[in-house]
Amino acid sequence: MFEKILIANRGEIALRVIRAAREMGIKSVAVHSTADADAMHVRMADEAICIGPPPSSDSYLSIPAIVSACEITGAEAIHPGYGFLSENANFVRILEDQDITFIGPTSEHIRIMGDKITAKDTMKALGVPCVPGSDGGVPDYENAIKVAEKLGYPIIIKATAGGGGRGMKVANNVGELEIAFRSARAEAKSAFGNDEVYMEKYLTTPRHIEIQVFGDGKGGAVHLGERDCSLQRRHQKVLEEAPGPVIDAATRARIGKVCADAVARINYIGAGTIEFLYENDEFFFIEMNTRLQVEHPVTEAVFGVDLVREQIRVAAGLPMSFTQGELQVNGHAIEVRINAERLPTFSPCPGKVKVFHAPGGLGVRMDSALYGGYSIPPYYDSLIGKLIVHGRDRPEALARLKRALGELIVDGVDTTVPLFHALLQEPDVLSGNYNIHWLEKFLAEKLG
C-alpha cells in the first residue's frame, strides 16, 4: 500500500480523497494555487505545496508543477479527483514514464474514451448499445446532408473531442443543418482545438442514465447500478439520484452486466461511468467517463461502499473488496449540486462566506470545502458543495432532502439552494416523471 499520495485537485473532492486516505493510514499531500492558500483541503492535508498562481492553466493544469510537487514530497501516487487533469491521457503517460502511480485507468483507456468516435466504436464492438449515427467524423457540410438524410431528422452534431455540452448543436430539418454544422465545428475548434464533429440521431425525450463500473485491471469488473442524472441545465447535471426512478431490478442487472463485461474485456482499472440516453426502454451509449464522477456519493450511499478507497486499493495492486453478488441496492439516495450562483441568471457569485452551517441527522451527508470566513475565489468552478441524502425509499429521501435544505445556511454569497426548494414543490420531480429537457423548460417558464 502507498505511504503517501498527492491529490491533484481542490475543493470538496480534494477533501473527499484526503478523508479516504486518512482512514487507510496514508499520508496526503495537497497542492494549491496562491488563491487557495487558505482553502480547507490545504488545512486538512498532512502536507501542502503551492504549485502556481490563481489561473488553472498555471496551477491545477500545470503538469510540470504537479510532477515536481510529487518529487519534492515523495508521494508515490496521484489521485486526480474530477475535472482538471483527471482525463488527460498525456498527463497519465508522463506519470507512467516517471513511475508515479496514477489512481485511475491507463493512459490508453483515457485516450480511447476521450475521443468520442473511438469510444463509440470500441463500445459497439464490446456489445454496448449505441445511438445510430455517422461512421466516424463528418468532414464537410455536403457529407452532413447525406448523413442527416440517412438518419432522419432531428439530428445532433457533436464535437469528437467534446464534453459538457460544448460543440453540440441540434438540427430539426435541412434548413437548420448548415448553421448547426458550421457553428458546432467553430465551437469545437474554440473549446477543444479540434473542429472534427460527428452526427447522431437526436432523441427527443430521453432520460440520462449512467452505469457505475469498477475494474481491477486484470479482467475482473463489477457494476454498481445506475444513477439518473436527467435534471440538467445546459448539459450540466443539477440533481442526481440512485437508483433511477424508472429502472427496475431486471433492467439494472441486464445493462449493468453488459457494461461490466465490456470494461472487463479491456482490462479496465478503477472507477468508470458509462453514460446512456434512455428512451422507450432502450439504452443508447453516449460516452464513458474514465474517472470518479461528481455524483459518486449517491452510489456509495445505496451500495454502502467507499469508491475512493477502492480506487486507491486497486491502484496499489490489491483486489476489489467486494464481488458482484455482494453489491445489493439498499434504499434511495439523492444528491443536489449547490453552486455559488445568482438566480435567475446563474451568474457566478464569488465572495466571502460569513456563516456556513451544514445540515446533519440520519442519512444526510454534506461534501463541501466551505467554512465561515472563507472567500470563494473567482477563478474556478462555482460548485461549493454537494448535499446527499439517503432514505429507505424515494419518498423518504425526498422528505429528508427538503428537511436538510432547510437546515443549510450559506450566508454572504448567493447560492442555487432556492432552485431546489422550488423543484421539491413540483409534481413531476416528486413522481420522478422528467427527462433531460424538463429542467430547461421549467426554468424558462418559472424564471423567465
Residue ranges of predicted features:
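ATP-binding N-terminal substructure of ATP-dependent carboxylate-amine bond-forming enzymes
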Residues: 1-126, 138-146, 396
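N-terminal nucleotide-binding beta1-loop-alpha1 segment
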Residues: 159
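Acidic/histidine-enriched active-site and ligand-binding environments that engage anionic O-linkages
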Residues: 147-156
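Structural detector of well-ordered beta-strand residues that form the stable sheet scaffold
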Residues: 29, 79, 101-103, 131, ...
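ATP-dependent carboxylate activation and anion-phosphoryl transfer catalytic cores
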Residues: 7-24, 48, 71-73, 89, ...
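A polyampholytic, Gly/Pro-enriched intrinsically disordered region
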Residues: 122-131, 153-154
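Internal, active-site/partner-interface "lid" segment
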Residues: 134-136
